[in-house]
Amino acid sequence: SRLEVCPAGCALSQDIALRISTHGGAALFIDYGKDRASGDSLRGIKHHQFVSPLQSPGRVDLSVDVDFASLKAAAEALKIDGLNVYGTVGQGDFLKQLGIETRLHALLTQPGITEEQAETLYLAYHRLTDEEEMGTVYRAMSMVSMPTGGEYEESPPAGF
């Protein structure tokens, strides 16, 4: 059994939480990863193909899944009043909540759009949202700082 830990990622998550709680605002994280630690996700990528991470040192891009659960736990461990962490949600659901289907329809019904342009738009939509493509592999998480004692309702940001 293997365990991946990213102390720098947890520290960065806490730094972002402190900054937005001090100055107000929100943060949005989108990347490929999991809602929990996944063990061994280290992989090499060369010419858009997965290869051994030890193949051709210095010439292979190294990549790991983001452990969103650790980032969320690190921010929540600070117990900051008014800081809320939302997600994760799959990229497909996130984009659909934001209206990607409405946007696609608007683009597809523009006067003068060619079949080739329409196909390109649909394929891009499919790649971003489909469960077999990037729709569930990529995840979204948000941190939002809401003033305490204000008139704001605690509700998740758009997409969550």
Segments from the language model and where they lie:
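Long, Lys/Arg- and hydrophobic-enriched amphipathic alpha-helices
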Residues: 1-160
